[in-house]
Amino acid sequence: MKTFVLVSCLLVFTQIIYALDIKEISIMNRILEKCIRTVPKRENDPINPLRNVNVWYCAFTKRGIFTPKGVNTKQYINYCEKTAISPADIKLCKKIASKCVKKVYDRPGPIIERSKNLLSCVLKKGLLELTVYGKKK
């Protein structure tokens, strides 16, 4: 029985560790800190800077996910694999990200505006809460 419990615990921890890309999270944390400091604060910005579309736009632009030509869709959706907390969260994260990409990029408009609308969509649908960033303040 003890062996079964130990193996079960190891499987759970392996899934959690597998789901997170610690190196990428560390890089993104440094980028987010810089973006939080440099993005001008506006009157209607949320108290938590991680809920600010402009902060995420800054960070994803620095990571090369948002470019002048638009969003690198594959890289954006696969970012869920690097930051989602559990395998179930990865699946839901990808689903939300895919729906928002389709919804936003099927419409005409400037690339920057569409990229920010994409971020607004995923934040409103709760994608952040599925990742390690949902736990930060």
Curated annotation (Swiss-Prot):
Q: Tell me the outcome of changing residue 56 to L.
A: In Sol i 4.02
Q: Which residues form the signal peptide?
A: 1-19
Keyword list, A-Z: Allergen, Secreted, Signal
Organ and tissue specificity: Expressed by the venom gland.
One Pfam family here: Sol_i_2
Q: Where in the cell is it found?
A: Secreted
A GO cellular component term found in this entry reads:
extracellular region
Statement: the UniProt record of this protein carries the keyword Secreted: yes
Question: So what family is this one in?
Answer: Belongs to the ant venom allergen 2/4 family.
Known partners and oligomeric status: Monomer.
What is the protein name stated in its UniProt record?
A: Venom allergen 4
